[in-house]
Design a protein with these regions (language model features):
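Conserved Helicase C-terminal RecA-like lobe
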Residues: 5-6, 15-19, 23-28, 32-33, ...
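Conserved helicase ATPase motor motifs in RecA-like P-loop NTPase domains
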Residues: 16-17, 135-150
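Conserved Walker A/P-loop ATP-binding site and its immediately adjacent core
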Residues: 21-23, 36-59, 150-152, 349-352
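Conserved helix-turn-beta segment of the N-terminal RecA-like "Helicase ATP-binding" lobe
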Residues: 47-71, 160-164, 364
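Inter-lobe coupling linker of SF2 helicases/translocases
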Residues: 83-88, 98, 102, 122-136, ...
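Conserved ATPase-coupling elements of RecA-like P-loop NTPase cores
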Residues: 92-94, 115-127, 149-150
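Conserved RecA-like P-loop NTPase helicase motor core
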Residues: 368-463
């Protein structure tokens, strides 16, 4: 914090549960009391503002204003913390920008969960940049500045430095993809030694320097997990970001990640094979047509992947499934039953999968209290109240969607976590499982990933590992894949289990089994 106070702009990339909120409060108080700042504006997602900041600030007896309408702007006094959600910022953008301009930009911005503006084309990113890019002091806090690829860091960098001399591009070479043979070619950087320009030209330049786009089938584009001009990017990160892991801040590593590989039962493999090889039979059962043949062709592979992952999560959610309770759900119930006196948390990603697990747990463990949480059924206040109810149960089961506990709703007393349905990156999953791992925690936390080996979940796990390598680079840790495999508890040949994309005899896209033998 001392190092960050010596600069006007910076980012704290501290892992979830490490005290970013307290650090932002300390910096805001110091700036207002000693450096003449009028007020500290805290901007974040609605759940973070309401469940965290709106609770923490009154607990410390600090003066603050929660901006929910225009009248609230008139109540702001010097020395106040000002809370604004990203959605409300978009609605009041013009008025907030005018208010800040009248105070000569003499405020401090604390953007909590700054990866929320990683998409430069989103309304929340545009409104945040419009209102705060010129303010005097800026602090960005996040658990991970990138989720999927390097280019997501560009809007956060632009917000910090406002395209000034602090963000000069020193990359002599830019890269682009040749549309004809899909190869990566290089050329001299026309902006070498100049600040990265604002908005779209700047995002395009940042991407060309560090992560060129590749064109795929149907003209769609993809971003890989590669890094170009890594040394130049590392220099920029070194002066901007202070990174600390949970272990470095708390002095203890209490996380233990375990993989639970499972084999498909015959009935499960049959429905999985049907979706993989005869997707045309069930496509319209689960996905509506857009009315445009070209769009339907573009979406076909994406829809097939989505349905394959749904089969892997809960095969009994498909009408074509003829078996009993799926092995993954039975395994989750058996593991929960073994922890008879433990509170267990289970996080899935979709409502229909959650319903399948809820039905099974009511059948197999009728005496255990079951608490179901989704974003649509539980309000912020109810989720806060659940903390005490779940603790008092002694051995309750918290079954929830991972999105319903993304930030600021903490259950630090839960030690067993099951994740039967993976996210597309570890950043999304860690936002969930770090709700149970806080700097005040003292006991070991066991996190179990339940995966069907030989299914598309193996590919998803490999993609999570590849993206985590990028995230670790952004945190100043240049590691190889073997170390990340160890971190995730992967002790089997994952690469041999990956499914592959190919074409059939008629030239149509097709998903195929990997090197593994399927009985």
């Amino acid at each position: 914090i001392n190092r960050m106070l010596q600069k006007r702009y910076g980012m704290l990339q501290w892992e979830q549960g490490s005290g970013k909120t307290l650090a932002a409060i300390a910096m805001g108080l110091y700036r207002m009391q000693n450096q003449g700042i009028h007020s500290t504006w805290v901007v974040s997602s609605a759940i973070s503002i309401r469940n965290n900041w709106d609770v923490v600030l009154p607990n410390y007896g600090l003066s603050y204003v929660f901006v929910e309408n225009l009248e609230d702007l008139a109540r702001i006094k010097p020395g106040d913390f000002v809370l604004v959600t990203l959605n409300k910022l978009g609605m009041l953008q013009r008025h907030i920008k005018k208010w800040i301009k009248r105070r000569h930009q003499n405020i401090m911005l604390a953007l909590d969960e700054s990866d929320e503006i990683s998409n430069p084309h989103s309304k929340r990113a545009k409104s945040t940049l419009s209102c705060f890019r010129r303010c005097r002091m800026k602090l960005l806090t996040t658990g991970t500045s990138t989720r999927n690829n390097i280019s997501e860091f560009a809007p956060q960098l632009e917000l910090l430095y406002n395209n000034s001399i602090n963000m000069i591009t020193w990359c002599r070479t830019t890269y682009y993809c040749d549309r004809e043979d899909n190869s990566i070619n290089s050329e001299n950087n026309a902006y070498y030694g100049r600040p990265i320009p604002a908005y779209k030209p700047g995002y395009a330049l940042f991407s060309a320097c560090h992560l060129p786009e590749k064109t795929t089938v149907f003209g769609m584009t993809e971003r890989t997990q590669d890094i170009y001009n890594a040394d130049e990017l590392n220099e920029l990160l070194a002066k901007t970001v202070i990174t600390r892991t949970f272990e470095e801040i708390t002095g203890k590593e209490i996380r233990r990640i375990h993989q639970v590989p499972l084999q498909f039962l015959p009935e499960e493999r049959a429905v999985y094979r049907m979706v993989m090889e005869e997707f045309y039979r069930v496509q319209r059962e689960y996905f509506a047509s857009t009315g445009n043949h070209r769009k339907d062709a573009m979406l076909r592979l994406v829809q097939q992947i989505t349905l394959l992952l749904r089969v892997a999560a809960a095969p009994n959610t498909l009408k074509e499934y003829n078996g009993g309770t799926p092995l993954k759900i039975v395994t989750a119930a058996e593991m929960t039953a073994e922890w008879e006196n433990e509170i267990v948390a289970i996080g899935v990603r979709h409502q229909n999968v959650l319903n399948a697990y809820a039905e099974a747990f009511r059948e197999y463990l009728p005496k255990r209290p079951l608490f179901i949480v989704t974003g649509s059924t539980k309000t912020f206040a109810q989720r806060r109240a659940l903390r005490k109810t779940l603790r008092d149960s002694g051995n309750g089961i918290l079954l929830c969607t991972q999105q319903s506990l993304p930030s600021s709703v903490n259950f630090e007393y839960v030690n067993k976590v099951l994740i039967p349905e993976m996210h597309f990156n570890n950043s999304g999953m860690s936002q969930f499982y770090m709700r149970f791992i806080r700097y005040t925690s003292t006991e070991y936390k066991d996190i179990y990933f339940l995966n069907y080996i030989g299914s598309l979940e193996s590919n998803l796990l490999q993609m999570v590992v590849a993206k985590e390598k990028i995230n670790l680079f952004m945190k100043g840790q240049d590691t190889d894949l073997n170390q990340i495999y160890d971190k995730f508890g992967i002790d089997y040949n994952l690469l041999a289990l990956l499914m592959q994309k190919g074409v059939d005899k008629e030239g149509n896209l097709q998903i195929r089994w990997g090197e593994q033998q399927i009985a």
